[in-house]
Structure formats: C-alpha cells, structure tokens
Amino acid sequence: MVTLRFLQKNRFIHIISFLLVLSSCSSSPELVQVRLKLDDLSKQWVYLCQWDGNQNAVVDSVRTNSRGKAKLEFRTHNADLFAITADKKEFPIVIVANPGDRIVIDGNFRNYKVVGSKESAEVKAMQDRLNSFHNDFEGLRFQLPDSVNTPVNDSIARLINLKIDSLKSEYSNFVKSYVSGNLFSLSSILVLTAKVGEMDVLPYADNRLLFIKVDSCLNRVYGDKPIVKSF
C-alpha cells in the first residue's frame, strides 16, 4: 500500500512536470528555416523583411554563396508574413512562415518554387496568376484603337472592352473564391490588396463586406500584428 501511494504521488509529479514542459513548449517561439537556392543571386546579400506598420523593415540578412545558396533562421509563435529582397525596393519573394516550417525556395529571384510551406506555395501561385492576368489585361488594352471615330474602330473597341470586362470578372471571382476559403490566412491580405498598375483588383467599394469579414477574422487571431492593424 505504501508503495502504491508512492507511485501515485510520483506519477502525479511526473504528470505535472510533463504539463509544465508542454506549456513551456507552446509558449516558446519555434525555429523556422528558409533555405535559398537562387541561381541568379551569386554572392549577394539578401534581406528578410517584415511590415512594421510603416514599411518593410529588415529583420535579418544573409549573403549567398557562389551557387546562390543561403539559409535564414528565425523564430515565431504563429504564422508570420515575410518578404525577401536583394535591393530593399522590390520584394518578389513573399512567404507565410508557420512555427517549425522548413521552407526551400528554389529557382531564381523572379521564377522560383516553394517547398515546405503550403501557404507560401499558394502565395506564389497567386502571384503567378496575377502576373498572367496583368499580361493578358495589358495585351488587350494595347489592341484598343487610338480613336473610335469610325464605326469599325468603335466596333473593335467595344469587342475588346467586353473581353477586358470578362477577364477582370473571371479573375475577380477567382480571387474572391480564394479569400472566402482562407479568411483566417495572412495571405488573404496580399490577395485582397493586389493591384495591376494603379487599378485595384478588388475595389473596396464593390467588395466592402468581404474586406470587413477578412479584417474581423484576422483580428481574432493576429490582432497584434502590424500588417493586420494596417489592413
């Protein structure tokens, strides 16, 4: 009986210790590794940036080797949005890093693949889709006649404008579908605020309810993040 009591007490102590360890682990930021393999960035500095409420602030930097390889490491408590740049002006690589992620970015600075982060891969796919939309949009605009003073030119302009409207509607529906299915994802901010030149892909006036819904959802989870506050 004495032994049993001792075992029960000892077991209780072990359980408490185990719970304390779990609590400690859950409150500690986990390591994230980002391995870069960028063919066009040999022996160059690259910068890891994060939105601080006013600008993309540099939080870390690393120099690639002769083969364009480098590794960035940082810690995070939950999902965080980062951009990678070589000149601190353009930010072609955007990642959403979750605790414990081991992300590999392979290719070149403008054309790369992401492995190890589902949401980062989705962001890249959305960027590619936006670039394709931009190219198609500009291609159609280029075909517009300089003048519509003749019936032929007027007819051509009407036809092309119909194609432009159809293209915009198709892409807009695609974006709204993605955002509606990812209301609690930081990537939704990037998608909602995307622009083609000076044109908003999803104008706020026409999509106010969706913007409000995303804002509400993200504030429940990431209300302390500057990028969510800025949104």
What are these regions (language model features)?
Residues S117-S120, S185, K225-V228:
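Serine-centered coil/turn micro-motif
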Residues V175-V179, L192-V196, D215-N219:
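Amphipathic alpha-helical segments within well-ordered protein domains
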Residues L210-F231:
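N-proximal helix/coil linker or "cap" segments that precede and/or mark the start of modular domains
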Residues M1-K37:
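Bacterial Sec-dependent N-terminal signal peptides
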Residues F184-E198:
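Amphipathic alpha-helical repeat scaffolds of TPR domains
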Residues V179, L183, P203-D206, G223:
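Structural signature of alpha-solenoid helical repeat scaffolds
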Residues C25-Y178:
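A non-transmembrane, solvent-exposed segment enriched in polar/low-complexity residues
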Residues D165-S172, Y204-I212:
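Helix-turn-helix repeat elements of alpha-solenoid scaffolds
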